[in-house]
A protein has these predicted regions:
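Surface-exposed extracellular loop regions of Gram-negative outer-membrane beta-barrel proteins
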Residues: 1-22
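Beta-sheet repeat architectures centered on beta-propellers
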Residues: 24-30, 35-39, 45-281
Length: 281
């Protein structure tokens, strides 16, 4: 290939043309823009958007990946310095991180598969003041006043950290009926002996009934007379199906889980709540 033909591989400004205008959506933070390889993500006035291109239809539908946390996210962004907002995408971890240093908050959007409403699963990391992020060679790096850090393991710089998850309030399709909670069940993947707390709340009251739970202990197997790794490897992944009696009643019910993470991990796969119908309102 000669230089003349090679040069034709690049876009000539004279060949550029406007194909489509997307109204009502614009990027408000330059460093929130990331290319995932199949999509472009960015922060707009209404939250995080994905410019998902459908080649077959020659269209560019806008996907609102922060729909489920829009109000909280937009409120934080409204107070923040937009020039300080940063974002990064990791193909290895399959997440998009949006960091708002002024709020000491990082929003983590799971990009593996969208939810039914098109939004992404999202968690919020609090108390983080990192100012720059880099995904490189399967690793994630970040900077703050203390230096350079790496995202890995299940501790926060050698210390434990708190994990909290709460559902929305739901009425089980019986809006005018009181629901009496009978049992709560959960399928979890976690480290052996990992402790966590299940919580039941009702009718939007800030009062919860707590139930202390523990991931089952792994059985220690011995090969001849030698114990393999002495049976003390706390990072072993276990699947545990937990079901316990629970209480509480109300028109709407909320379920929550809290845990202190300190070297082990906890992954909540499924939640089942068993209720009995009460009186008609």
């Amino acid at each position: 290939m000669d230089d003349q033909s090679a040069g034709k591989q690049y876009l000539d400004r004279a060949d550029m043309a406007l194909v489509e205008v997307i109204n009502g959506v614009g990027c408000i933070a330059r460093d929130s823009i990331v290319n995932t390889g199949t999509d472009i993500l960015f922060l707009s006035e209404s939250g995080v958007r994905a410019l998902s291109r459908t080649i077959q239809e020659k269209s560019q539908p806008m996907r609102d990946i922060s729909r489920n946390v829009r109000d909280t996210l937009v409120d934080q962004v409204s107070r923040a310095d937009k020039d300080q907002i940063k974002a990064v995408y990791s193909d290895h971890f399959a997440f998009y991180l949006l960091a708002i240093p002024d709020e000491e908050t990082v929003w983590c959007f799971d990009m593996r598969a969208p939810l039914e409403n098109g939004a992404a699963r999202v968690t919020r990391w609090n108390g983080l003041d990192h100012t720059a992020w880099l995904a490189f060679d399967g690793a994630m790096y970040m900077t703050n006043i203390a230096g350079i850090a790496e995202y890995r393991g299940f501790q926060d710089n050698g210390s434990k950290y708190s994990m909290q998850y709460y559902t929305n309030y739901f009425d089980f399709g019986m809006q005018n009926m009181v629901k009496i909670v009978k049992n709560i069940a959960a399928t979890v993947i976690g480290s052996t002996g990992q402790k966590f707390v299940a919580k039941i709340g009702t009718d939007y009251e800030d009062i919860y009934t707590s139930y202390n739970l523990t991931v089952k202990d792994a059985e220690v197997s011995e090969y001849n007379i030698a114990e393999y790794n002495i049976g003390e490897y706390s990072g072993a992944a276990l699947i545990d199906n937990i079901r316990i009696p629970a209480g509480g009643s109300g028109f709407v019910i909320q379920v929550g889980f809290e845990s202190e993470i300190n070297g082990g991990f906890l992954n909540i796969q499924q939640i089942d709540l068993y209720v009995k119908q009460g009186r008609l309102n």
